[in-house]
């Protein structure tokens, strides 16, 4: 297990606070791990998942023999990597005779395994298998639409669980406002049967329509695959209750240098910058300066009169 150290500096304390559970969570980073043995298909799937999540994923290419997500004691390495990388969702790939092309998707809470779902990969098509106009290719880091088609996602418990995990995997950071011009991709999940889901990645093609809202078409850009549900493990009640805890009101931001007084009410401190008096322009309105200006004015008047008299005499 990773050694727990108390922070000795303010920076270390802020880093630990940023990694702690929050009422309003930030975007979830994804950890991609390889098992003892992986097939060529599974390696391609994990590589393309990393490309789709680029900027929000960390991938370890080394094989891990000690990770057994569904076995007791096999979660220790997962929790260690989660704490080390600050990732709250993971993708673990393995290939055996009993479970070929096996992918385990899981979520973490406070660096503990929250829930797990295991799927098998079938009918995988890589990005290179699709031909399309490259100008419609989705840009890196854009927000996706996530579409779930089929009643099974509402009725079947395993499909509902898979829907929650896939949403957390692909949605990225939750934001209040979106720029519609930046929406250029969609993940389409179709429930074929109670245990099988077709997943494909599409680009959004905008076309002219008779109104302000453009008409949208989906262009399949890949990858695409069938996900066959094998095993799943839901979170225990105590962990779920702790993870689902919410606040009725949003936490208020602390106001700096502000106090409440029983008599004066709300009081505050204002820190003014140092005043450089030598560089300040001061208006001199003293009596002495006025007298000097008056004398100069009279002198100028006498000089102009003398010049006029000289010109007239000539």
Curated annotation (Swiss-Prot):
SMART domains: Brix
Compartments where located: Nucleus, Nucleolus
SS bond list: none
Tree of life domain: Eukaryota
Annotated GO CC locations: nucleolus
Key words, A-Z: Nucleus
Protein name: Ribosome production factor 2 homolog
Natural source organism: Arabidopsis thaliana
Lineage of the organism: Eukaryota, Viridiplantae, Streptophyta, Embryophyta, Tracheophyta
């Amino acid at each position: 297990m990773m050694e727990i150290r108390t922070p000795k500096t303010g920076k270390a304390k802020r880093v630990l606070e940023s990694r702690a559970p929050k009422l309003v969570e930030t975007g979830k980073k994804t950890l991609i791990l390889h098992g003892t043995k992986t097939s060529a298909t599974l390696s391609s799937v994990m590589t393309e998942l990393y490309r789709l999540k680029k900027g929000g994923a960390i991938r370890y290419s080394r094989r891990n023999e000690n990770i057994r997500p569904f076995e007791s004691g096999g979660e220790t390495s997962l929790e260690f990597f989660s704490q080390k990388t600050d990732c709250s969702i993971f993708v673990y790939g393995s290939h055996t005779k009993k479970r070929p092309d096996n992918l385990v998707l899981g979520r973490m809470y406070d660096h503990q395994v929250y829930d797990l779902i295991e799927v098998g990969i079938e009918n995988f098509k890589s990005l290179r298998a699709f031909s399309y106009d490259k100008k419609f290719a989705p840009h890196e880091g854009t927000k996706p639409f996530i579409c779930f088609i089929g009643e099974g996602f509402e009725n079947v418990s395993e499909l509902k669980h898979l829907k929650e995990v896939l949403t957390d995997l692909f949605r990225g950071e939750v934001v209040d406002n979106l720029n519609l011009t930046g929406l250029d991709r969609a993940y389409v999940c179709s429930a074929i049967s109670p245990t099988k889901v077709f997943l494909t990645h599409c680009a959004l093609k905008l076309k002219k329509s008779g109104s302000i809202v453009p008409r949208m078409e989906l262009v399949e850009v890949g990858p695409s695959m069938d996900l066959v549900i094998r095993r799943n493990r839901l979170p225990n009640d105590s962990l779920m209750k702790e993870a689902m805890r919410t606040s009725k009101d949003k936490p208020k931001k602390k106001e700096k240098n502000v106090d409440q007084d029983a008599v004066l009410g709300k009081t505050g401190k204002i820190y003014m910058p140092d005043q450089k008096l030598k560089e300040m322009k001061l208006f001199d309105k003293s009596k002495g300066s006025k007298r000097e200006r008056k004398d100069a004015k009279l002198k100028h008047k006498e000089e102009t009169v003398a010049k006029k008299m000289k010109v007239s005499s000539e």
